[in-house]
Amino acid sequence: MSAQQAQDQVDAPTSSLPAITQSLPDRTMDPAAGGEGPPAGEMSKNAAKKAAKKEKQAAEKAEKSANKGIGKAESKSKPSQKAHKKKTDGPALIGIDVSKEQDFSGWYQQVLLKGQMLDYYDVSGCFILKPHSYFIWETIQEWFNNKIKKMGVKNCSFPLFVSEDVLKKEKDHIEGFAAEVAWVTHAGNSALERKIAIRPTSETVMYPYYAKWIRSHRDLPLRLNQWNSVVRWEFKNPQPFLRTREFLWQEGHTAHLTEAGAREEVLQILEHYAHVYEDLLAIPVIRGQKTDKEKFAGGLYTTTVEGYIPATGRGIQGGTSHCLGQNFSKMFGITVEDPSAKPEEKKPALHVWQNSWGLSTRTIGIMVMVHGDDRGLVIPPRVADIQTVIVPVGTGARTTEAEKTALMAEIDALAAVLQAVGVRVEVDKRDYTPGWKFNDWELHGVPLRLEFGPGESAGHYVTASRRDILGKDGKSTIPITELGVQVPALLETIQADLYKRADATYKAHVKHITNWDDFTPALNEKNLCMIPHCLTEQCEDEIKDMSARKVEEETGEAQDARAPSMGAKSLCIPFEQPEGIEKGVTKCTNPNCELFAEKWCLFGRSY
């Protein structure tokens, strides 16, 4: 199923499948819990030893990386707490051996490594994206490219190097990135006369050329986008996909004649970002505007989509669309003549209005954190590189080669039916037991597993197991004659159900708070807080300090300034405002603030 097919299905209704009355085979999903072991001749002792050694090395590598501070964004546990961290039930050889609820940081590392999403690199804070995760990014690219090209946006590529003079040209802008800029100072053994920066973002790279290319109002709007990587170096707690020193993203940069044209595009792009999360990744987001304190440095205003990580109770910024106003066009001299001036009048120069907007591979990390469980990844069907896997079952030492060959021929035919209707399907022909394969595919988050053996062949059906619902509740049977219809429908049902569950969880953890005494307790219960707020920077700072200080007093834990915030910060001013604020009457929720509330503002601990 391509990204275009996925988009075609976004608004398609999902319906429950017709009831199937055939009884389901009783096959264990856990070989370590008394299930099927390796049949004779299927898996040698040497193969088992190699598999165990490989998993041990991966675990040691993850532990070594963790000791260096990688992925340690969660607050440190007390020694007494560490002893109570829960191990998950089930086989540890190929599966996750820590609980997502009890040890989220350890779980996140394991699920990414064992789920084949990435590997660690020898430069701290940099990671290798493996095909399993990169496919998700490719799907997002294809979907988003299709949307922005319809808007008239064209893709391009600018150099990754920035001269120091250009980078410093816009002081307010670069102050937001100054500590994170990586510099090239040498070429071989020779020191450069002028050091060169590696782009943290591309405003200062691109805008000198916008001034060169835009000569008339007829050249507007100019809409360019880059798919590239950027480097932001200075931080102590890198987390895969969330905070990395190099990351992949797209950055759009556009120029417009009027503020109205720029504003329309800002909201249009933000809506596309929201749909990436909601329609592709099955993740709910809240649309809103950043406060002046949290907006993009040098911009006029910033709009955002904000997600929520239930396991930690933290908010997370999903993507931002900025109106830069005329700040950069004045700095870089990007002007056109006023087309509304009368012919006999001298046409004054107008500074163009500009936008920038970006979405990164952080999307993948958010997806993993929201949907994954103690068995491993849970990948929404629309972005899964393998949507359905077919596992041969029911064969053993007594099964003849002819019977096995005939069964595999039937399975290949089933796969061909699914491929013909656009399902990304794989047949697992590896020399492992079915129980081992079940665990492995669950670990990798494949949305749907189909089992097919002699019993299914005789009954003309397949046994289907959903990844998002484990056990008998997630099992059903599908007649072979209905395979090409019911499997795509079931995949869409899985997609819809993932979103519904995540959306219900998000909504349940946004608390409307008007009494300050309820604020920190709500945060401690893993909630985000919607409060009446005055929207001043000083008040935001005070709320963060007060909520952080209260946590430190209660736990005795000092706050790491670069770790996910203990204190609550403003996430956004939601576009959808609840009722209840009366202008000039409703006070700001901060008890030390004497100002009236302007808007409901979403606060929370965040990444």
Residue ranges, per PLM feature:
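NTP/phosphate- and nucleic-acid-binding module
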Residues: 2-607
